[in-house]
Design a protein with these regions (language model features):
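C-terminal structured domains
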Residues: 253-351
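Long, hydrophobic alpha/beta structural blocks
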Residues: 1-296
Length: 351
């Protein structure tokens, strides 16, 4: 069960110097919980980062704030230190976003929003959550004062960071950090959090290729070589494309419309097993595919008979190139499309 030990909310207005800390009424707690759940469990598009320097502004504030709460017995009675430190984190984000807005004003605008911070305790482990969330702004008709509001539905989290923490002897140490950014804005991780990616695109591509390939060998290959090689080929084709990969979408594309030739293959069970890996830390759930990784693993060698082996590279539609037939005599043959004249002439004889 998740317990929120401390939480804060600051409105960020790029036109003023400091963030505005807001008291959180009890009926707003459901919003805070939803933002935390999205950042910690519901969001499946994130990357894992590590802390190269524990003395940067945000990481130092997180450690000191969390240590103070732990020293108070996980119940915040004296809010002085937590409020000062959460104010510092909010000021850092506002300053960074003001700089980015000035630099990028001719191209785009920084997404408007507020910053939610929370220290949570769940299953005996501490985590600190920072989320940049959507808010709307309007001016009071009488006072012309600027007001902020939050949508009743479709609560959007623009960016988030979930910092694993360990507490020992009154000190708090950072672990891995799960970072989400809906726009790919570099400033969130690089300038605000000041963290570095734990996995490169090459490592992510290798790990996804290995994990999915291992599950296909375990659950599909033993039942149907035809289905195994079709799915393996589709996986290679997707990862060989120079594009952004969303792991959940990748698995969906593999299985949504695919109908196994062998009815004993439970494709939904395979899909669930593969999606369960998204909660681990062996790869990021969103990364840029590295085609060079797949190129090294894209050739498959088939034994045709004692004298012929067939080597097939990754191809989008292998059935258009190679067909398998059984003659009435019982003989099994492969029909291979050939566009190389020399190879064709080496075997062709006019009747």
């Amino acid at each position: 069960m998740m317990e929120i030990l401390y939480r804060s909310l600051h409105n960020l207005d790029l036109s003023i110097e400091n963030p505005v800390r807001k008291e959180i009424p009890s009926d707003f707690n459901s919003y805070i919980v939803e933002y935390i759940k999205f950042a910690t469990t519901e969001n499946k598009v994130s990357r894992i980062y590590f802390v190269p320097d524990h003395n940067t502004t945000v990481m130092h504030c997180i450690a000191d704030l969390s240590a103070d709460v732990v020293r108070q017995g996980n119940t915040v009675i004296d809010k002085t230190i937590p409020l000062e430190l959460s104010d510092s984190i909010a000021r850092k984000l506002l300053a960074i976003e003001q700089t980015v807005q000035t630099r990028m004003a001719h191209i785009t605008d920084v997404q408007r929003g507020s910053i939610v911070q929370a220290l949570i305790l769940e299953d005996g482990g501490y985590r600190f959550v920072i989320a940049k969330v959507e808010h709307s702004e309007w001016y009071d008709g009488e006072t012309l004062a600027k007001n902020f509001g939050f949508p009743g539905e479709n609560k959007r989290v623009w960016k988030s960071a979930v910092v694993d923490l360990s507490a020992e002897d009154g000190n708090v140490i950072h672990g891995n950090i799960k970072v989400f950014c809906n726009t790919g804005a570099l400033y969130w991780a690089r300038d605000f959090l000041e963290v570095k990616e734990a996995n490169s695109d090459k490592v992510n591509t290798e790990n996804v290729l290995n994990i999915v390939g291992r599950e296909l060998r375990r659950s599909v290959k033993k039942k149907s070589l035809y289905d195994y090689y079709n799915l393996k080929n589709s996986l290679n084709h997707a990862l060989q494309s120079d594009q952004m990969i969303n792991y959940s979408d990748l698995i969906g594309d593999l299985f949504d419309t695919y109908q196994p030739s062998d009815p004993s293959i439970d494709k939904e069970a395979v899909r669930r097993k593969l999606l369960s890996h998204a909660d681990g830390e062996k790869f990021d759930t969103q990364f840029h595919a590295d085609p060079s990784v797949v190129k090294k693993n894209s050739k498959t060698k088939y034994r045709v008979n004692a004298y012929v082996n067939l080597i097939v590279e990754e191809v989008h539609d292998r059935e258009a190139l190679i067909k398998a037939k059984k003659w009435p005599s019982g003989e099994q043959v492969l029909i291979v499309s050939c566009d190389d004249d020399d190879t064709f002439e080496a075997f062709y004889k006019e009747e």
